[in-house]
Structures are given as C-alpha cells and as structure tokens.
C-alpha cells in the first residue's frame, strides 16, 4: 500500500457505494456503543461484512482484483477493500478483541499504514459524512433485493443461473423507483443472467397479490376484534 490513495470522487460507483455503507456503519456502531448496545453494534458489523462486503462487493469485483498490471481501477478496488477491512477491525475491537487485533495486525504488517502494534491502541474510526450517499445506497439495495428474488425464483422452478433468460419483468410503484432500478439495470441483468428488463406499471393479470395481517403490530391495538379484522383483510381484492 505504498501508492497514493485514489481520490474518493474518482473511484467507480461500486467503490463509492461500499464506502458510503462503511461510513454509515461507523455512524451506527458509534451510536450503538455510546448507548451501551453492543449486540446491535455486532449485528450491524456482521450484516455489513456478510451481506455487502463479502457477498456483493468482493464477488462482483473479482475481475478487478485479478486483472494484470496495477491500473488505477485495480488499485482503487484494493484500497477500498483494505479500508473496509481495517475499519471493520477497529469497529469490532470492543466486541471481539482478539480476532479484531489479529486482523488489524495482519493488515498493518503487510502495509505499515499505522505505527501502533495493536488495534486497541489505534483511534476509533471517524465517520466521513461527505462520503455517505443515501441515493446510491438505495439504488444498490434495490439491485441486491431484485437479484436475490430472481435467483430465488430460478431455484424454485429449477432453472440454473447459467441458462440465460430473455426478459425480466419488474413491477414499479412510481417514477422514482423506476429511475432507481434503471440506474442499476445492467448490474441486475448481469447478476441474474437475463438479456433484457421491462418495467410493468399495471400488474393486473401478471401478479397475484396477497395481503397478510401483521398480528404482532395489530394485536395490541385491535385485540378484541383481531379475528374479524384478519378475516376482512384476507378477503380484500387485488385492487
């Protein structure tokens, strides 16, 4: 890690996305720990690493990591991943002190980025608000959700991902949602191996809508009439 950092605004969108999530995570974990909620802090870190960093960012950027030569694109990918790992080590230090210290020391031994010999002697991460892009986070979350649903449908009907499909029909609620999905369209199509995507405004005849009462929320408020209310809800038409 001897090269200068690639400027944040010059990094690819997917790098800026994971850095946005990372800074949101710093903010959340700092708040949880200040309020003596280590369990919520630990879960937030776990969700970030498993759902976003490992299952999405690293997997989608394998070609960038493996490409020959040290281009700015490859350097940006490695620097972004390193920043995430080092920051996660610092965030988890109060919760998992030994593993966090091992991860931090392994990273520092390879790069010499810090002059301390333990994660517990380093400063706690600081959130960079200017790097948080909620619109970008929302778009990527839609890409993850849609991709997950399509892959689940493939498994349900036993159609393997390696078999390309012609078109993916996506119902949208409004123009904002349509624009958000359009921005990550190519990513979704690549992830689920579909050639094209069409947006559906009127889902009549295509989707079967079902409504199910949330007993946990409705029960305390409508306990005495909950049974009748549930029956009325389930009898609602698709319109």
Task: Please report, for each region that a protein language model flagged, where it lies by residue.
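Feature 926 captures the class I aminoacyl-tRNA synthetase adenylation module centered on the KMSKS loop
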Residues: 1-239
